[in-house]
Swiss-Prot record:
Gene from which the chain derives: tmx3a
Covalent S-S links between cysteines: C48-C51
Transmembrane regions listed in the UniProt entry: 369-389
Entries under InterPro entries matching the protein: PDI_TMX3 (IPR052250), Thioredoxin-like_sf (IPR036249), Thioredoxin_CS (IPR017937), Thioredoxin_domain (IPR013766)
Principal location: endoplasmic reticulum
Record flagged with keyword Flavoprotein: no
GO cellular component, one term: cell surface
Glycan-modified residues: N308
Catalytic activity line of the entry: Catalyzes the rearrangement of -S-S- bonds in proteins
The name this protein goes by in its record: Protein disulfide-isomerase tmx3a
Amino acid sequence: MANMRNIILTALLSAIALVSGYVEGLDDKFTEFRQNELWLVEFYAPWCAYCHTFEPVWTEVGAELKSLGSPVNVGKIDTTAHTSIATEFNIRGYPTIKLFKGDLSFDYKGPRTKDGIIEFTNRVSGPVVRPLSSVQLFQHVMSRHDVIFVYIGGESLLKKEYYKAATEFIVHTYFFTASEEILPKAVTLQDVPAVAVFKDGTYYIYNEFIDGDLSSWINRERFLSYFQIDSYSLYQMGELSKLVALAVVDEKNPSEESIRYKTLMERVSTEYRDHYKSDFQFGYVDGNEYVNGLIMGELAMPSIIVLNMSIDGYYIPESSTETIEDLLQFLNSVLDGSTTLLGGNGFWQCAKRIFYKGKNTVMSMVETAPVFSCFVLGLPVGVVVLVIYATCTAVPADDEKPEEEATASPALDTHGKKAIESQPESTEKTSEAKKED
């Protein structure tokens, strides 16, 4: 029985060591060899609570990529031990995930899941723009991805702009090239070359005169018109010029009101797309945690809210939203400025947000790493206490002695007086001595 237990324990430890071996611990020397290979790297800190939660996921990512025969190496770096690395790559949050491809580095900003990270890795590590050579391949790609961009045509200035934009946005979505022959029969083009986005079960053609810069158009169109938005997608929308119209609901406890809010949002996103496509991104979020952090308060569920992610501002309807007309009226009031903007990035709001985030960070640190947190928080307090104690108990310097002598003058005067009174006796003795001589 004991032998069987030892065998199982040995096998378990061997499996853990084998899986952990797929993730390489890196140090400052990483900068010397990173350009020669593809690397997917996690930058973490020991005090980061989420980094500990995320560690098994990262191990799974390393094992999965290895089993798929991926050329991408997986590693991790402790930025508290290798501070120069954190400075060089401008690491500001934890965990930060970057893919290094030659001289370029790409930040992963999606959900911290194995599937999401592996999809990002496969997309970014391969060609920036991939050719679609057959109708079957086109249909296969369409079935696998919610949003794809396709360049149709031969060499042109538009193609150069397309490749440049693809390099910028490959971290978010897929880019392909195709000829007219392999497109679905339902797709009709006015001119070639052209750029199209396929999403929402249909397609939209880029028009330079209406849509403006190609890169900006791709940035606006890389999301579905209406979808479930998580905190990572919401964070990315700070890069858009759009406002984000949300139904905030609790999917675990659905209600008639929450279903109505979601339905209204979806209807507006499709039925009024041409009217609002440049101004609003529509969706819904499950839970109010991220929104609460943004507004620094508690938002009731279900609710409707419009976020301006570029300035951390938000709008809330002043009356109930019962019909699509009510929602349209609210959206129009946001655009014409008749609804009050709350929050924002003013001085006091920024100060309040810093305090709010700092408080949450400290609470998270104390909950997950109490000993380390006590050291980090107690060290500066201890230094201040020592400085105050040293100041209060300091020995007076030499230049302060005259003041002490001045305060002791009465005693000195007394002694001085006695010294003067004794002088006549010595004078008399001296005179008598002279007479005797």
